[in-house]
């Protein structure tokens, strides 16, 4: 994953200090792009251990059109917990519960989860019901019937619903492209937390690309990752330096269940990353 390491270096070399919504502070560089050829291996960062389970379940959650964290926490995925917890803390029902207490209540109390586990009309809702349009289904059908179309786009950015979202979409929209019997996907991401979030985004959309390629009978091409505000949080600088000191290892392989022919039929056990070797995990705090 030299491309990813070069992205970290580019931000450090060209970026400027910038304040942000979380009051953490960043080094930010505007407008970056990296290309990942999936025929050369699955683009999963090897210079630190990445939590694959979270990536896969989150992607399945998007595809389901779900916007409540209960599905995630029930499956041991905790990457979205902080946002609804912050909303809960401002409610009249908050009695000093810790984040861990909040998550336990989401798991055990369906009514509580329905009320306080909701993130609003975020990714999954927009992918599958953008003002009544199932964008993901339409994109797949267009790939099958009109692969040369320049309109094979799925957008998570619904301007009229941004205020209702716990967090406006960072990975805002993506486009499919067919050429030489290969399917490629380009993602535009308005904001990229390059240490914590971007490795997830690269892997997630690469899996999605492989899924759609399989069900539309194309080979996998490239994942092209374009990011607007590409940043490293100031409290991640030590972790970034540690990661840059490590040598990348051989890329793993993605294996999908070949029997799956419909995007909605994929389950966790149908998606496997094999031969993944990595350096140890590097912990860092998410900015909320």
Swiss-Prot record:
Output the GO biological process annotations, alphabetical, semicolon-separated. dTMP biosynthetic process; dTTP biosynthetic process; methylation
InterPro entries xref list: Thymidate_synth/dCMP_Mease, Thymidate_synth/dCMP_Mease_dom, Thymidate_synth/dCMP_Mease_sf, Thymidylate_synthase
Keyword Methyltransferase appears in the UniProt entry: yes
Major subcellular site: cytoplasm
| Record-annotated active site | 170 (nucleophile)
Origin, by domain of life? Bacteria
Taken from the UniProt entry, a GO cellular component term is: cytosol
User: Pathway, per Swiss-Prot/TrEMBL?
Assistant: Pyrimidine metabolism; dTTP biosynthesis
Enzyme Commission (EC) number: 2.1.1.45
> Where does this one sit in the cell?
Cytoplasm
Q: Which principal EC class is assigned to this enzyme?
A: transferase
Subunit structure as annotated in this protein's UniProt entry: Homodimer.
**Annotated function:** Catalyzes the reductive methylation of 2'-deoxyuridine-5'-monophosphate (dUMP) to 2'-deoxythymidine-5'-monophosphate (dTMP) while utilizing 5,10-methylenetetrahydrofolate (mTHF) as the methyl donor and reductant in the reaction, yielding dihydrofolate (DHF) as a by-product. This enzymatic reaction provides an intracellular de novo source of dTMP, an essential precursor for DNA biosynthesis.
Q: Which family does it belong to?
A: Belongs to the thymidylate synthase family. Bacterial-type ThyA subfamily.
Protein name (Swiss-Prot/TrEMBL)? Thymidylate synthase
**Source organism of the structure:** Mycoplasma mobile (strain ATCC 43663 / 163K / NCTC 11711)
């Amino acid at each position: 994953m030299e491309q990813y390491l070069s992205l970290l270096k580019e931000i450090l070399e060209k970026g400027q200090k910038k304040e942000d919504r979380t009051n953490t502070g960043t080094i930010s560089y505007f407008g970056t792009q990296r290309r990942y050829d999936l025929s050369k291996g699955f683009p999963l960062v090897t210079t630190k251990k990445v939590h694959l389970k979270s990536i896969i379940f989150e992607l399945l959650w998007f595809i389901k059109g779900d916007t409540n964290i209960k599905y995630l926490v029930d499956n041991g995925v905790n990457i979205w917990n902080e946002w609804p917890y912050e909303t809960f803390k401002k409610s009249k029902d908050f009695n000093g519960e810790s984040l861990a207490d909040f998550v336990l209540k989401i798991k055990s109390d369906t009514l509580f989860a329905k009320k306080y586990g909701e993130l609003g009309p975020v990714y999954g809702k927009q992918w599958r019901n953008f003002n009544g349009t199932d964008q993901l289904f339409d994109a797949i059908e267009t790939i099958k019937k009109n692969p040369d179309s320049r309109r094979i786009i799925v957008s998570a950015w619904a301007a009229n619903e941004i205020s209702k979202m716990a967090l406006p979409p960072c990975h805002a929209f993506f486009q499919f492209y067919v050429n030489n019997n290969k399917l490629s996907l380009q993602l535009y991401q308005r904001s990229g937390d390059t240490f914590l979030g971007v490795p997830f985004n690269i892997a997630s959309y690469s899996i999605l690309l492989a899924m759609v390629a399989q069900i539309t009978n194309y080979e996998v091409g490239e994942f092209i990752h374009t990011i607007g505000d590409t940043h490293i949080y100031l409290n991640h600088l030590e972790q970034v330096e540690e990661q840059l000191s490590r040598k990348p290892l051989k890329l793993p392989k993605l294996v999908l269940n070949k029997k799956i022919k419909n995007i909605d039929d994929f389950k966790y056990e149908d998606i496997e990353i094999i031969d993944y070797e990595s350096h140890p995990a590097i912990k860092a705090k998410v900015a909320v």
